[in-house]
Amino acid sequence: MMKNMILPIAFTALIASMTACSDETDPILTQKDWDGTATYFQSSDEHGFSMYYKPQVGFVGDPMPFYDPVAKDFKVMYLQDYRPNPEATYHPIFGVATKDGATYESLGELISCGGRDEQDAAIGTGGTIYNPADKLYYTFYTGNKFKPSSDQNAQVVMVATSPDFKTWTKNRTFYLKGDTYGYDKNDFRDPFLFQTEDGVYHMLIATRKNGKGHIVEFT
């Protein structure tokens, strides 16, 4: 059983005022010679993006970066946004691999949307870890129910596993629900995972309780 801790979100506002003046003595800005002063990558992708990855069709939503200790590269999962998206089933998880942040290899669709009546009809943001004990990748993600009834959860944290980061299998018995722990059943999303030096895995989830935003930690 996972243990949870309540971490209320503290919102802090910082107000700064600035004044500006100008006269004829202001320095004249000149165009920088970036070719002579900077080193940068030239993308080799056939579709020709220069810095930010964009799929050939649609757009990238909510990038979920993960360093792959097996392949020794970075995997960036993202929500594939077609615009327009289907009414009920949208935002499957796609991915790319990169070693330098400029040259990308498309991994295609990794985790598909569920059926119209399933909990993950629409997929929301998640996070990934690699467990060397069983040599599996675990991606925890948000399952968004299409038109949930009053007794159903609009958002649930779900999980899929893969031995090679290519073929993913959803665990249809794992459903982490906010109301099980006293939190909102409709706002329970965006799991973020990390491992501390003691080897313990942690998962942070954004949710609400009594009308206030919370970050919940599971270990």
Task: Please identify what each model-predicted range represents.
Residues 7-15:
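Hydrophobic helical h-region of N-terminal Sec-dependent signal peptides
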Residues 1-7:
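Bacterial N-terminal signal peptides that target proteins for export
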Residues 22-190, 194-219:
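Beta-rich carbohydrate-recognition and catalytic domains
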Residues 17-20:
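C-terminal motif of bacterial Sec signal peptides marking the signal peptidase cleavage site
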